[in-house]
Amino acid sequence: MLKRISLLVAIALSGFVIAPKPAQAQALTPYVLPLDYELMTEQGRYLASEAQQLAEYRQFNRALTLAQLAVQLAPNDAQVLALLGGLYLQAGETERALTLLTRANSLAPEEPRILFALGATHLQRQDYLQASTYLERGLRREPNNANALFDLGNAYLLLQQHDEAIARYNASVAAQADFWPSINNIGLVLYEQGQADQAVAKWEEALALAGGEEPEPKLAIAVVRHAQGNCRAMVNAGSQQCQRALSMGMTALEQDSRYADEDFLRQNLWGHRLMQTTQQFFGAPAVRSLLAEL
């Protein structure tokens, strides 16, 4: 509640107090409530915390609405600005995210979470070098952030610096042992380097850490096992290995049909070699029939 403060109006002229003339028409002096900026900022932070909780429950639209109001109340609070920027990034509005996060960074230049968010924004903008710069700055202040190490690994992968990418993915797992996306992406790098068996081993490890349910490592294992079994040849198509690979891959596609979209796979950093193998898998008659239904 805003506090209502009484206001005494006096008009001073040459040291004299001039009384109003009741017999004459006179404009009323407007009564203006003074703004309590400290209270507004406090209310903005409270709304931002509510928005953060909604985002954690994946209620992003409601979170975005609250965060927008929070910024109106606390326009100079770095954390509030960063929250709204992060929600815009989640919504794919990268330019709005960049504007807010840049402003937040100017207010709190050493805050690692803001630097991480700027790195993620530049990743989406495909400015991988800038992304790596922000992520490295943030990691100097918070070196064991598994998500940021994962993002930095992705930036290095997209810069074709594979050894650096694997090093950051391994650091991510060292920081958080069950961080399966980093293990999954080590598999992506290894496969592009021609190490198919080692890649499959990483995907199997990632799948186990994810409780056996994540479609991405499941599909990757399937398409590579299908290729290794030479399952396109009619003589091999009925083999146990080929049937297991087909079943696993089709289950993954049924779990999440986005993985049937080659553009989506590329966005998830599936490289040229793995995409070629996947296209062969998608050409199998049973898979083609499934794709037509998805």
Report the location of each language-model feature:
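Structural signature of tandem alpha-helical TPR/SEL1-like repeats
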Residues: Y57-T65, Q90-R103, R125-R137, L158-A171, ...
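Ligand/cofactor pocket segment of small-molecule handling proteins
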Residues: R140-Q193
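Terminal, low-structured helical/coil segments at or just beyond the last alpha-helical repeat
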Residues: Q26-L35, C231-R244, M248-L294
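Helix-start (N-cap) detector for alpha-helical repeat units in TPR-like alpha-solenoids
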Residues: G44, A78-Q79, P112-R113, A146-N147, ...
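Structural marker of alpha-solenoid helical repeat scaffolds
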Residues: L73, L107-A108, R141, A175-Q176, ...
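N-terminal leader/linker segments that initiate helical-solenoid repeat arrays
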Residues: L2-Q79, Q90, F281-F282, V287-L294
